[in-house]
Regions:
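Short, structured coil segments at secondary-structure junctions
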Residues: 92, 121, 157-158
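Acidic, Mg2+-coordinating phosphoryl-transfer loop and its flanking beta/alpha structural elements
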Residues: 142-176
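Active-site neighborhood of HAD-like aspartate-dependent phosphohydrolases
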Residues: 7-66, 166
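Substrate-recognition "cap/lid" segment bordering the active-site pocket of phosphatases
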Residues: 99-142, 148-152
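Short, acidic loop-to-helix structural element flanking the phosphoryl-transfer center
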Residues: 64-98, 105-110
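Short amphipathic alpha-helix with an adjacent loop that forms part of the alpha/beta core around
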Residues: 134-138, 173-179
């Protein structure tokens, strides 16, 4: 005898999703890498720069440290986020594409590409500024990202946005979608 649940499962068509996943703050721990070099979290560093040199200098000095003084090795050496490998292992069977925001210097594109080569070789990566990620949104297209504004923009283009808070929460939301 077949259960009603079994019949219901068989009647539901399988939805083919396209998964896009952010890197920094989802898979790769940007903050830990920054703190390794600066001795302060990014927020603490920005506050210190603002106090010493004024708020107009914050972004220039922040990105100068990362892209000019450290360069490619900053990006290539970023450690996995806690739970990042677990999340990657969960989404990998669905052939995700990384959708990552680069800094304005080419060192981030080069370093992030090397990070992918070192940790998850063969994975496609697309570089887009956060505000332009929604160009890839649409029905059945999922974005996992840690920026609320990026997720809201994605959803406004009929995409499925999952705001990353932690690995378990993301996996739970993916399971709710049948993944």
């Amino acid at each position: 005898m077949i259960s009603i649940n079994k019949l219901f499962e068989e009647e539901q068509p399988k939805i083919n999703y396209t998964i896009y996943c952010d890197m920094d703050g989802v898979l790769a721990d940007f903050e830990a890498r920054f703190e390794h070099f600066a001795g302060l979290s990014p927020d603490e560093y920005r506050k210190e720069i603002a106090q010493k040199y004024g708020s107009k200098q914050v972004d220039n000095m922040f990105w100068d440290l990362i892209d000019k003084q450290i360069g490619v090795r900053f990006w290539r050496g970023i450690p996995w986020m806690p739970g990042g490998r677990q999340l990657w292992d969960y989404i990998k069977p669905y052939n995700p594409t990384l959708l990552s925001s680069p800094s304005f210097d080419n060192s981030s594109r080069m370093g992030k590409s090397l990070w992918v080569k070192d940790h998850i070789p063969g994975t496609p990566i697309i570089f887009r500024q956060a505000k332009k990620k929604s160009e890839f949104a649409g029905p059945n297209k999922i974005l996992i990202d840690d920026r609320e504004d990026t997720i809201m923009s994605w959803k406004s283009k009929n995409g499925i946005g999952i705001l990353y808070k932690n690995t378990d929460q993301v996996i739970s939301e993916l399971k709710q979608l049948g993944l």
